């Protein structure tokens, strides 16, 4: 037994040795693994955006686990690892999700890249927000970066050329309003501008908004998206979201912009030679040399181009100082801006001071509240465009503006002095506006919130006009002026419930229900002075005589009450449906039609979510959209539906009242039925995004002043008279073809086509307004006049067959008439002569097209459509390139298919006096001698037929392609700035606005719009000219 034990020891020893070695190795491995895991148990870092600003709320998840955290207010995070994959996933709405291997790192700092168009990006809609992927309406968006690239003074300038179906025109000089048209003109006289909603508050004017305060602008173009705003949404809705504070350490941002601008185009005006030629030819002379007997005299040599005299270098300086920040319970944003702009025309300028404070509170986990307060003071030094620009176009070139002693040449007859008017006339607009908007939101239950808002708007405007003696006729002109004070104020209260709940991860139900009350007040006082005692004192205590017909005061008011609701259903983020209804009651309409109903429905299908599409990995989104809605327009004056009486009517020396307006109890809403069909496509990991929309907008019960028989004692009555339709297509393409660590290329293109048609009018024959004809079956904007076919070369050239075919006269070597031929064959038949006002036309007269074939040209029968002021095609194209902090961008916009009537040319070319100087083309291109082949007729003053009516010779194409903006800049690397310790962001940029324009238009600018008159687009009486602006900018954040 002892031996056995001895034999067993080596075996046991061997086994123990092997087991012990294994055990030791296991302990060593375990120790290494534990130590390794402990070494990697915590990873910290900071997450920033591409602009170097920390991003709070970024999800940081360990891949394959539920372990993770979110970044704090300063973008910092700390995550403790658990066994699993050593990879961190970083995700945040609007940014690309990134996966980063941990390896052996303890600190991982990361810069998130913004997605070109995130499907999870939030889009603002009426009374709420929605993921872009779930939007089933036609919504265009512009962010703050795009807005700031053109250094706009007016918020609307920043969206010019960037959104399909949206046309923006800048009117007037410094401080002038911009005009915006969405999907064509759908009204006659009820206002064509959209509704503006700022942070949920409806406003009538956005000139008091500093573009630097805007975070984004969302344009609701289709009826169903806008219908929740009911009676004000027929022309679309522009939703403006202003900037707000972000959690984190308080930041201070300084923006500074400085620019110079100059006139980039001149209107052709006649020189002294041409004026002398005109004076000779207008009397019937055939001397076209332009020479005069006193050819060495001062006036014969003098050439005065008023445009050179009134233009100047424009200068603009703009600075914004903003503070923002916040904590867990509150956040704030406060920006104060100052703008000082001197126009490119003497006497014009603009100053603006704005302040915007926005505070948001989380009172507890159920209640949030906030307030926004703004104040704006604007000072616009304007000029009377008609008395300056139109006058300069026809002023004699050999008449001085300033005498040799330095005084202004006084005005006499029709020889106005545009320089004196630009520099001395007072045409000032001063206004102060203020806004207060408050909200409280309460979470009543999971998915259910109640929100109430209360907003106030106030605006006080003072208009001051004064015409000193240097600007009135020296013989009988009187120093005159005007002072008008307008006061606008309104309040609105909104109360609504919002519901959003998802059931079983399949069914998402959203709901909205609420009511609102709005009321507006308007007051004015107007003082009009026919004559001042002198121009030393320009206040109204120096008035010698008032105009009692226009001096007075008045006040109006109107109210709007509304109920609204919306419900939406989403199945598996695949099938989408939304329906809404709004019921509005307006005090502006007749007693029989106070209330209007505005329903809408939207349908959407994400085909890309279907199983049969999953294999097509390059398609991120394929969505079909369809919608139908009825929207309204109530933008008419107050009290237009009721009979009005005014005092001041005397009978037997007794003051009494008399009717001044007929009532119309059936006056009601304009209603626009809108259909929209669209498709959205996102490809290649959202690098390419395409949207296509087809729309049809039909407006019924158009509001207009209808002429009535004079026997009633009134000239017209406001009524609902007909319908108009807009049909069109829109295409938007956005892409990011190249994107890597160092270089990014972003490009976009948009295109729109619109066709307009008047479907019905109360009078089937239509009606005229200005130089336009409105008639059934035709488009709005049709210019109405005579068709000019050329100029008769000879007296004998006025010869036609009874069928209206023009004959060819033949002459011998001595210019003696021989005979007529028709198609090369001698003609011996009957001959008709074209007449104007029963007077036979001669050589040098205009060949007007005879519309009815009676060989007598008259206004009733021979005018026709000679042009149209509405464009067919419009859009824009942009590119941006980013490389290692440098960025370069440019923006084109274009417009095709519309015309302009050159009214300024019409006035100076057709004037019968010897004071207005015609255009250079009119003088040098005039018929003088028999046989002349010319564009323009004889200048002989006795030929009144050549000066009659609007005609096609003054219609020009308004087509253009404009390089609207180019910008070059550099943003300093955040790592470099961090070493300084006190600068978070620093960027420099230089840009040029209105670089150049490809157009054949002869005037200052082919972008005319309609200047508030929807029925008369494209009428050019010379407005404030376009300008090229060179800008430098600095942005720094501390």
UniProtKB/Swiss-Prot annotation:
Induction: By ulvan and rhamnose.
Intervals of motif TonB box: 120-127
Motif position, TonB C-terminal box: 1021-1038
Subcellular location: Cell outer membrane
Pfam family of the protein (one): CarbopepD_reg_2
Residue ranges of domain TBDR beta-barrel in the record: 249-1038
Family matches, as PROSITE patterns: TONB_DEPENDENT_REC_3
An annotated GO cellular component: cell outer membrane
InterPro entries: CarboxyPept-like_regulatory, Plug_dom, Plug_dom_sf, TonB-dep_OMP_SusC/RagA, TonB-dep_OMP_SusC/RagA_CS, TonB-dep_rcpt-like, TonB-dep_rcpt_b-brl, TonB_rcpt_b-brl_sf
Membrane topology field: Multi-pass membrane protein
Taxonomy, superkingdom: Bacteria
SUPFAM superfamilies assigned: Carboxypeptidase regulatory domain-like, Porins
The TBDR plug domain, residue ranges: 131-243
Signal peptide: 1-39
Keywords: Cell outer membrane, Membrane, Receptor, Signal, TonB box, Transmembrane, Transmembrane beta strand, Transport
Protein family membership: Belongs to the TonB-dependent receptor family.
Stated role: TonB-dependent receptor probably involved in ulvan degradation. Ulvan is the main polysaccharide component of the Ulvales (green seaweed) cell wall. It is composed of disaccharide building blocks comprising 3-sulfated rhamnose (Rha3S) linked to D-glucuronic acid (GlcA), L-iduronic acid (IduA), or D-xylose (Xyl). The TonB-dependent receptor may mediate transport of ulvan oligosaccharides from the surface of the outer membrane to the periplasm for subsequent degradation.
Protein name from the UniProt record: TonB-dependent receptor P39
């Amino acid at each position: 037994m002892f031996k056995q034990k001895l034999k067993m020891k080596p075996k046991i020893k061997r086994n123990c040795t092997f087991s012990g070695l294994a055990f030791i190795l296991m302990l060593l491995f375990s120790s290494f693994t534990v130590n390794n895991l402990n070494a990697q148990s915590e990873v910290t870092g900071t997450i920033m955006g591409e602009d170097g600003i920390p991003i709070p709320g970024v999800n940081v998840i360990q891949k394959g686990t539920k372990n993770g955290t979110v970044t704090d207010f300063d973008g910092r995070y700390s995550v403790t690892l658990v066994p699993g994959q050593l990879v961190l996933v970083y995700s945040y709405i609007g940014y690309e999700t990134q996966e980063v291997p941990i390896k052996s790192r303890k600190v991982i700092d990361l810069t998130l890249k913004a997605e070109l168009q995130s499907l999870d990006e939030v889009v603002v809609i009426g009374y709420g927000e929605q993921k872009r992927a779930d939007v089933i309406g036609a919504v265009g968006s512009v962010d703050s970066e795009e807005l700031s690239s053109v250094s706009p003074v007016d918020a609307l300038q920043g969206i010019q050329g960037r959104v399909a179906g949206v046309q923006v025109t800048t009117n007037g000089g410094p401080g002038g309003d911009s005009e915006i048209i969405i999907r064509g003109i759908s009204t006659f006289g009820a206002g064509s501008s959209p509704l503006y909603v700022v942070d949920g508050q409806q406003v009538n004017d956005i000139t008091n908004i500093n573009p630097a305060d805007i975070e984004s602008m969302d344009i609701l173009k289709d009826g169903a998206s806008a219908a929740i705003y009911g009676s004000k949404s027929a022309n679309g809705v522009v939703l403006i979201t202003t900037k707000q504070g972000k959690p984190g350490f308080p930041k201070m941002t300084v923006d500074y912009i400085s620019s110079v601008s100059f006139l980039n185009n001149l209107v052709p005006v006649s020189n002294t030679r041409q004026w002398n030629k005109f004076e000779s030819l207008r009397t019937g002379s055939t001397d076209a040399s332009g020479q005069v007997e006193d050819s060495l005299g001062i006036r014969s040599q003098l050439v005065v181009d008023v445009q050179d005299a009134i233009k100047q270098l424009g200068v603009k300086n703009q600075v914004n100082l903003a503070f923002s920040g916040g904590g867990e319970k509150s956040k704030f944003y406060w920006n104060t801006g100052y703008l000082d702009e001197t126009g490119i025309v003497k006497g014009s300028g603009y100053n603006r001071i704005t302040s915007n404070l926005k505070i948001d509170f989380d009172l507890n986990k159920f209640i949030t509240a906030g307030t926004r307060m703004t104040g704006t003071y604007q000072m616009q030094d304007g000029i009377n465009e008609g008395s300056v620009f139109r006058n300069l176009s026809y002023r004699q070139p050999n008449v001085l503006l300033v005498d040799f002693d330095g005084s202004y040449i006084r005005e006499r007859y029709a020889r106005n002095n545009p320089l004196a008017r630009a520099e001395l006339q007072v045409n000032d607009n001063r206004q102060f506006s203020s806004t207060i908007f408050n909200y409280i939101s309460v979470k009543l239950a999971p998915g259910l919130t109640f929100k109430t808002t209360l907003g106030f708007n106030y605006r006080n405007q003072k208009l001051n006009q004064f015409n000193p003696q240097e600007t009135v006729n020296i013989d009988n002109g009187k120093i005159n002026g005007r002072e008008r004070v307008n006061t606008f104020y309104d309040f609105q209260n909104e109360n609504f419930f919002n519901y959003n709940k998802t059931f079983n991860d399949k069914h998402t139900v959203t709901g909205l229900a609420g009511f609102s009350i709005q009321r507006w007040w308007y007051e004015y006082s107007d003082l009009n002075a026919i004559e001042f005692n002198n121009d030393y004192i320009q206040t109204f205590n120096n008035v010698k005589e008032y105009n009692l017909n226009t001096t007075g005061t008045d006040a109006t008011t109107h109210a709007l009450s509304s109920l609204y609701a919306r419900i939406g259903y989403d199945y598996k983020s695949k099938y989408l449906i939304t329906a809404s209804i709004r019921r509005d009651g307006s005090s502006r309409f007749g007693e029989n039609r106070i209330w209007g109903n505005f329903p809408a429905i939207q349908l959407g299908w994400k085909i890309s979510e279907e199983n049969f599409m999953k294999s097509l990995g390059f398609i991120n989104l394929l969505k079909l959209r369809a919608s139908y809605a009825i929207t309204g327009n109530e933008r008419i004056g107050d009290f237009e539906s009721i009979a009005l009486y005014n005092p001041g009517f005397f009978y037997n020396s007794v003051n009494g009242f008399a009717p001044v307006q007929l009532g119309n109890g059936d006056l009601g809403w304009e209603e626009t039925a809108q259909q929209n069909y669209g498709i959205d496509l996102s490809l290649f990991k959202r690098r390419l995004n395409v949207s296509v929309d087809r729309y049809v907008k039909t407006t019924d019960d158009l509001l207009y002043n209808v002429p009535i028989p004079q026997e009633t004692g009134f000239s017209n009555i406001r009524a609902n008279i007909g319908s108009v339709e807009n049909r069109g297509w829109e295409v938007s393409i956005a892409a990011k073809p190249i994107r890597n660590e160092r270089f990014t290329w972003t490009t976009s293109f948009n295109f729109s086509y619109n066709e307009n048609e008047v479907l019905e009018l109360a009078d089937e024959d239509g009606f005229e307004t200005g130089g336009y004809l409105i008639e059934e079956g035709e488009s709005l904007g049709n210019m109405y006049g005579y068709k000019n076919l050329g100029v008769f070369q000879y007296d004998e050239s006025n010869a036609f067959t009874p069928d209206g075919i023009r004959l060819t006269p033949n002459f011998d070597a001595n210019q003696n008439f021989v005979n007529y031929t028709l198609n090369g064959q001698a003609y011996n038949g009957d001959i008709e002569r074209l007449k104007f006002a029963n007077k036979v036309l001669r050589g040098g007269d205009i060949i007007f097209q005879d519309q009815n074939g009676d060989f007598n040209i008259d206004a009733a029968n021979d005018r026709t459509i000679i042009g149209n002021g509405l464009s067919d095609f419009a859009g824009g194209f942009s590119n941006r390139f980013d490389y290692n902090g440098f960025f370069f961008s440019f923006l084109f916009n274009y417009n095709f298919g519309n015309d302009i009537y050159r009214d300024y040319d019409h006035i100076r070319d057709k004037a019968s006096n010897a004071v207005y100087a015609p255009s250079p083309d009119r003088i040098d291109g005039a018929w003088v001698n028999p046989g002349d082949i010319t564009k323009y007729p004889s200048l002989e003053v006795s030929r009144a037929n050549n000066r009659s009516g609007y005609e096609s010779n003054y219609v020009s194409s308004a087509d253009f392609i404009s390089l609207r903006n180019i910008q070059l800049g550099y943003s300093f690397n955040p790592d470099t700035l961090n070493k300084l310790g006190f600068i978070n962001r620093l960027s420099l940029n230089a840009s040029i606005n209105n670089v150049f324009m490809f157009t054949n238009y002869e005037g200052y600018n082919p972008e005319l719009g309609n200047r508030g008159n929807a029925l008369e687009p494209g009428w050019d009486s010379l407005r404030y000219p376009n300008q090229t602006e060179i800008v430098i900018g600095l942005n720094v954040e501390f």
